[in-house]
Every structure is written in C-alpha cells, then in structure tokens.
C-alpha cells in the first residue's frame, strides 16, 4: 500500500476519519514538530529510510494521545524497541521527547535491549528472563555485574566510573 506519511500518522487518530478536523491538524502539527518529520508529510511512506519510518511510527503513537478536543486521552506510552534503526542523533531525540513526556506527567514504558541506553535514560528498570521479572529497581540498584551475568549467562562488566556495560 502506498500511503503518505500524513496518512500513516492519521491512522493513529483514534476518533476515526470522520473526526479529521482542525483539531487533528493541530495535533498533527505538534507531533510533526516534536518528531521533526513535518517536511515528510506528503512523501510516500514507502520511500522513507528505516529511521524515518521509525520516526513516523513514533509520531503515530504520539497522536493517539489526543482526542478530537485535543485533550490528553492517554497517560501512558508503551513502546517496544523504539530506537531500533535510528542513528545516534535521532535515538537521543526520541529519548528526549519521551523524557519531556514524563515531565508532562506521562508514564513511559519501554522495552530495550541496549543496556547502556536503559541505564542512562531510565528511572526504573525491570529485567525479564523467561517471562519472569528477575530484577527491578533503579539502574544503580540492578546494573550489577552479578545480576547481569546471571540474567544473560555471559561475563558482564560494569564500569562505575564511566557507567558503561560491557559483555563478552
């Protein structure tokens, strides 16, 4: 299917196509600016890079937070690997948008496999192995060599001075 970027984001508007109004346009403008994709709205989604597609999907997620009265509809954002296919600058941009959302009162739940990213940008971390939570707490509480080695079955080192995790 060949949809424009705007149409892909529009699919996230939970009120349905009959409610595409000026309120939607305001929400679209807001998420377009936040995700820095406004210039892509008329472009075919199929022509985007993997990182651009990821940003469009993120914008579609954000627009779901507003109803036709542009009042906040949801207080939680749940994302699975939102930084996949993003270069470092766009990864940080997305993380900073999410941090801003937490300051606005939103709860943000993210599944990440990048341990360093999880350590540096999370307030709380849960490690799940075989469907069970085996460690939960602040990054400083759970990013311990013993815990990480048990979870991953690898030799894991954590450098307290640089706050970097290495595994081999």
What are these regions (language model features)?
Residues 23-40:
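Conserved ABC ATPase "signature" region
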Residues 136-137:
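ABC ATPase "signature
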